Structures are given as C-alpha cells and as structure tokens.
UniProtKB/Swiss-Prot annotation:
Belongs to the universal ribosomal protein uL23 family. One of the early assembly proteins it binds 23S rRNA. One of the proteins that surrounds the polypeptide exit tunnel on the outside of the ribosome. Forms the main docking site for trigger factor binding to the ribosome. NCBIfam families: PRK05738.2-4, PRK05738.2-5. Keywords: Ribonucleoprotein, Ribosomal protein, RNA-binding, rRNA-binding. It comes from Paenarthrobacter aurescens (strain TC1). It holds the Pfam family Ribosomal_L23. GO terms for cellular component: ribonucleoprotein complex; ribosome. Part of the 50S ribosomal subunit. Contacts protein L29, and trigger factor when it is bound to the ribosome. The lineage of its organism: Bacteria, Bacillati, Actinomycetota, Actinomycetes, Micrococcales. The keyword Phosphoprotein does not apply. The keyword rRNA-binding applies. This is Large ribosomal subunit protein uL23. SUPFAM superfamilies: Ribosomal proteins S24e, L23 and L15e.
Length: 101
C-alpha cells in the first residue's frame, strides 16, 4: 500500500532559472525552473499547472551536481540542484511579473 502526501506546489517549484539559454527557450514555449530534488515529473507538472494556470505538454528534468570549489580550508562543494524544463501546450507564463521600470 502506498501512502501519498500532498505537497504544496510552492515546495516543488522553487524559482525560475534566469540565464541566456532559458530566455532563448521561452520563445519555443519552454520554461526552466529550479525544483525540489526529491520531486518527480508528475509532481512538477501538477505544481506548474496549479501555480500558473496553464496546461503542460511535457517535462524534462536535469540533475546538476554541485561544483567542487577550493576554499581557504580545503575543498568544498556547491549545492547540487535539479532543474525542470517545462513545455506548455498553449499560453505563456509571466515569470517576471510586475510593471517594467
């Protein structure tokens, strides 16, 4: 018997990714988000549909290992992240909402 817990969508989708590559994908109807590393594609799809009121066509996920960095005291490591590239069926997401200055 599996027990499912209902996650808050804001705990699944953490933030949009702001980069040149993600800006280029927006023209194709693809949006990139940082997501919780423990979440799966189904949870990500439900969260995006609930938060932004859009229909999701597909989800591609990427697990990125944290970079190894030299510190004063030896070697450290940056945090590992998971990204989701969300393709919409139709419509757009206003990621950077608010008026432009």
């Amino acid at each position: 018997m599996s027990v499912t817990t209902i996650k808050d969508p804001r705990d699944v989708v953490l933030a949009p990714v702001v980069s040149e590559k993600s800006y280029g994908l927006i023209d194709e109807g693809k949006y990139t988000f940082l997501v919780d590393p423990r979440s799966n594609k189904t949870e990500i799809k439900l969260a995006v549909e609930k938060i932004f009121s859009v229909k999701v066509d597909s989800i591609n996920t990427i697990n990125r290992a944290g970079k190894r960095k030299r510190t004063k005291f030896g070697w450290g490591q940056r945090k590992s992240t998971k990204r989701a590239i969300v393709t919409l069926k139709e419509g757009t997401i206003d990621i950077f909402g608010g008026p432009l200055a």
